[in-house]
Swiss-Prot record:
Its EC number is 2.1.1.192. S-adenosyl-L-methionine binds at G176, E177, S208, S231, L232, H233, N307. GO terms for molecular function: 4 iron, 4 sulfur cluster binding; metal ion binding; rRNA (adenine(2503)-C2-)-methyltransferase activity; rRNA binding; tRNA (adenine(37)-C2)-methyltransferase activity; tRNA binding. Binds 1 [4Fe-4S] cluster. The cluster is coordinated with 3 cysteines and an exchangeable S-adenosyl-L-methionine. Specifically methylates position 2 of adenine 2503 in 23S rRNA and position 2 of adenine 37 in tRNAs. It catalyses: adenosine(2503) in 23S rRNA + 2 reduced [2Fe-2S]-[ferredoxin] + 2 S-adenosyl-L-methionine = 2-methyladenosine(2503) in 23S rRNA + 5'-deoxyadenosine + L-methionine + 2 oxidized [2Fe-2S]-[ferredoxin] + S-adenosyl-L-homocysteine; adenosine(37) in tRNA + 2 reduced [2Fe-2S]-[ferredoxin] + 2 S-adenosyl-L-methionine = 2-methyladenosine(37) in tRNA + 5'-deoxyadenosine + L-methionine + 2 oxidized [2Fe-2S]-[ferredoxin] + S-adenosyl-L-homocysteine. This is Probable dual-specificity RNA methyltransferase RlmN. Its cofactor is [4Fe-4S] cluster. It is found in: Cytoplasm. It is an enzyme of class 2 (transferase). Reaction proceeds by a ping-pong mechanism involving intermediate methylation of a conserved cysteine residue.
Length: 363
């Protein structure tokens, strides 16, 4: 049996039977051609994967038995197993998925008036080391394959199928730094955006980075219509370095230059995520400083009242202070909103459920 074209297969993929969810339509067409099959079968395979959401290759009944055997020999469908599922009173659902090698990752379904949004994970753990985040506890174990990211959305969609609902948007803001897994992230974006894939519109997809500057330039050059966000969390270098050690490598002034390049290249505005930490970055003077930093930048600021993480020392900003911060930014002409909080009664903070399960395993 012909192998997949190695120039097309990303180096992060496992050499043994990778998930078929890792491959774009053109890659499957090429594999079919190399194995004596008609390339139009690729569209049929995509239909079985993303519209009918089958659980095995045997269920792909309009494919020949020989082709189904070839698929089963070369690929697996998915390696995700649901280990834990939590449901909040507000409808938020958090999934802990176990991977083929025993590692676990988190995925969150958030319900909004405008639809259902899925927050996906791109890495097992994270190397960035943000001092407020549960995702970095235990460090980085490995990157996810595109198929492991795609399968998160498919798994959540299968859960929604029970109530005839649909995933309407995707945010890449789960565990890990997406730009640390750049090629697999791009493949994921193309697969879920494809009209024969999950067909999620580009403007309903958001990717967030902590600020890996070279990849911001590379992402801008992709000219994708994907929404783009940066985890900023500070109005100046001193505070950002305290909260986010990555700022020591990729400094704030250089980050802002990359932001301007992205905006000029794509014509799109950028979002800044700004977590409010009591007594650290949440004073009115910090809001004034943030407004100075963002002056003339085509952007939106998303203020985030932080979730409590037991392993971290930060405290929540009082509600009236959050509103004062927002009011100050608005008075300076900054487009700003306060993120609606969800999942209070479950392990909602990013990486929190995974960290909790890891603690239970070591007891």
């Amino acid at each position: 049996m012909a192998e997949l074209n190695k120039t097309k297969v990303r180096k992060e993929l496992r050499t043994e039977r990778p998930s078929i969810y890792s491959f774009e339509l053109d890659e499957i067409k090429q594999w079919l051609t190399d194995n004596g099959e008609k390339p139009f079968r690729a569209a049929q395979i995509f239909e079985w994967l993303y519209e009918k959401r089958v659980s095995s290759f045997e269920d792909m009944t309009n494919l020949s038995k020989d082709l189904r055997e070839k698929l089963n020999t070369r690929f697996v469908l998915t390696t995700l197993k649901t280990a834990v599922k939590q449901t909040s009173q507000d409808g938020t659902m958090k999934f802990l998925f176990e991977l083929h090698d025993g590692y676990t990752i988190e995925t969150v379904l958030m319900r909004h008036e405008y639809g259902n949004s899925v927050c996906v994970t791109t890495q097992v753990g994270c190397r960035i080391g943000c001092t407020f985040c549960a995702s970095t506890l235990g460090g980085l174990k490995r990157n996810l394959e595109a198929g492991e990211i795609v399968a998160q959305v498919v798994k959540v969609q299968k859960a929604l199928d029970e109530t005839d609902e649909r995933v309407s948007s995707v945010v890449i803001m789960g565990i890990g730094e997406p730009f640390d897994n750049f090629n697999e992230m791009l493949a994921f974006l193309k697969i879920i955006n494809h009209d024969k894939g999950l067909n999620i519109g580009a403007r309903h997809i958001t990717v967030s980075t902590s600020g890996i500057i070279p990849k911001i330039y590379e992402f801008a050059d992709q000219q994708m219509q994907i929404n783009f966000a940066i985890s900023l969390h500070a109005p100046n270098t001193e505070i950002r370095s305290r909260l986010m050690p990555i700022n020591r490598a990729y400094k704030l002034p250089d980050l802002m230059e990359a932001v301007k390049y992205y905006i000029n290249k794509t014509g799109r505005r950028i979002s800044f995520e700004y977590g409010l930490f009591g007594g650290v970055n949440d004073q009115v003077e910090h809001a004034e400083e943030l407004a100075d930093l963002l002056e003339g930048v085509k952007c939106h600021v998303n203020l985030i009242p932080v979730n409590y993480v037991p392993e971290r020392d930060y405290v929540r900003t009082p509600r009236d202070q959050i509103f004062a911060f927002e009011k100050t930014l608005k008075s300076r002409g900054v487009n700003v909103t306060i993120r609606r909080e969800q999942g209070h009664d479950i392990d909602a903070a990013c990486g929190q459920l995974r960290a909790k399960e890891r603690q239970d395993e070591t007891r």
